[in-house]
Amino acid sequence: MGQENSKCPHQSLAEKRYKVERPKTKKVSSGSATERCLSTQSDEKNAARRLTVSSCDVSAEDDLPEIKKLSVCEPNEDEATSMTNAAAAAGGAKSKCKHFLTRRERILLEQSWRKTRKTGADHIGSKIFFMVLTAQPDIKAIFGLEKIPTGRLKYDPRFRQHALVYTKTLDFVIRNLDYPGKLEVYFENLGKRHVAMQGRGFEPGYWETFAECMTQAAVEWEANRQRPTLGAWRNLISCIISFMRRGFDEENGKKKQYSYNVQGFSSNRARRSISPYAPGVH
């Protein structure tokens, strides 16, 4: 009876007098309980995946070697793609870098890189890293090279290891020029990792040193012959430094906010402990 009355098409007296409209009920999907359970499980798996895509763990198959002292690593292709997709799903600003290089610039960079690699992979990273340490000798302490004379740097195994990271990073960039979101996510994470290096002397002003040395290295290996190619390198390096700086500033801001909250919590506890209304205080 109750169900039949609820489905009655006739209007009640209150509806006629006050012209009250009946609320429209939504139809419930007729899917089985098994289908609903499967969809719930898939949603939980996707949520767990979204929570873990921001990690930057290195496996044995990664292109860049892990340097634990600096916490610098390159995410593999699948991981970088997952992080990019998660950022796009979250509605972040990751899609704004879609066209930071033109198609022509990407072609020029790929051609330049192929030509430059003929001189030897180690030579490229070694040139950039040596220029950085020469321009800013204080940076040597960050990498544990402060006691190595400038003339002996290129023979030090630690220098060679870090120089190889520069080379492999550039190779990773060139291979992923068609995936700007992947590059942005990687270099933002790399910038965040530099926050921990402040305790060893890293300063935000070093970003400019990195940019200038990388640009100067490109000028030297191009020998000023191809102005459009040099312009493409400048644009690429500018974007890389911009992504790293943004990640660094974001992580540094979170760290400062956390320290402020912890200090505020500690001071509040201290004030409560000396309150005149506390038990045992006369």
Curated annotation (Swiss-Prot):
Induction field: Induced by paraquat, a chemical causing production of reactive oxygen species (ROS).
Stretches assigned to the Globin domain: 100-249
Residues that, per the record, bind heme b: H162, H194
Chain spans, region Disordered: 1-46
InterPro entries linked: Globin, Globin-like_sf, Globin/Proto, Mb-like_M, Oxidative_stress_globin-like
Keyword terms: Heme, Iron, Metal-binding, Oxygen transport, Transport
Entry keyword Transport: yes
Biased composition (Polar residues): 28-41
SUPFAM superfamilies with a match to the protein in the record: Globin-like (SSF46458)
Regions of compositional bias (Basic and acidic residues) in chain numbering: 13-23
GO molecular function, one term: oxygen carrier activity
Described purpose of this protein according to its UniProt entry: Involved in oxidative stress resistance.
Similarity remark: Belongs to the globin family.
Name by which UniProt lists this protein: Globin-related protein glb-13
Gene name in the database record: glb-13
